Amino acid sequence: MVILENVYKVYNEGTQQAFEALRSINLHIAKGETVILSGVSGSGKSTLLSLIAALDKPSSGKIVVAGELISKLPDLHASEYRAKRIGVVFQHFNLLEDLSVEENVIVPLIHSGLSLSTIQEMAAKSMQRAAIGHKATQSVKELSGGEKQRCAIARALVHEPELILCDEPTANLDKANSLKFIEILEMLHTLGKTIIIATHDPLFEKLSFVGRVIHMEDGIIKT
């Protein structure tokens, strides 16, 4: 499902401020596998997620997702790749605060070419999965932190992505809401989704549905 071969990422390359964020990353993740990227802040796990999401490009190396080479995609094709294959749950939610929950959830489908009724059906299904359907018409700015996270999950799932990427998904949640989020992840795992979670929360490493914990330190995978 996800293959990284000899991936490097250098910021400010060719300058005195050059910083090697990732070095010699080789990683294969199977379809349907749930993987934890573990490490302290600055270890490279969020950078790695951004490359898999085609939000940034590697300095060198190859990244293949579901048979598609995504490491050198032009920006337009990268947007199409994200809209088709992946859902991303960000640490800070990245929601449109003045819109309702439903309006936020349908954002990934705006340019899909689907009918309004189909879009609404897909949004309703996704909100139900994320246990936020009862707040569909409520403004996002009125939600609690846990509710905002569930809205972000519903938005990430609305287009039925094959791959789900989560970047420090419980960093802004209390323990009760963190456990609710984990329940949703377990449900997605049973549906056969491929899930990659970047976190330093030790709670994730103990979950029965997690296939592997990959430890990162100073931009490399520790073995």
Model-derived regions, located:
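Conserved ABC ATPase signature
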Residues: 139-143, 147
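Catalytic Walker B motif of ABC-type/P-loop ATPase nucleotide-binding domains
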Residues: 164-167
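ABC ATPase NBD coupling module
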Residues: 70-87, 190
